[in-house]
């Protein structure tokens, strides 16, 4: 196996792991983005910015 081939197999392996991780963290990241959007809204409305 050449260096390039081994690198390619490693990257495809890590891509698989990333996709599994992404499917798990997708829900929490969506919740996080909703939370940060609400926080930004409070700031825009002249309220106290939660930081």
Swiss-Prot record:
Domain of life per record: Eukaryota
Protein name: Uncharacterized protein DDB_G0276231
Naturally occurring in which organism (per UniProt): Dictyostelium discoideum (Social amoeba)
Lineage, opening ranks: Eukaryota, Amoebozoa, Evosea, Eumycetozoa, Dictyostelia
């Amino acid at each position: 196996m050449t260096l390039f081939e081994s690198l390619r197999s490693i990257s495809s392996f890590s891509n698989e792991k990333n996709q599994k991780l992404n499917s798990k963290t997708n829900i929490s990241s969506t919740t996080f983005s909703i939370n940060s959007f609400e926080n930004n809204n409070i700031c825009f409305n002249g309220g106290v910015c939660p930081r």
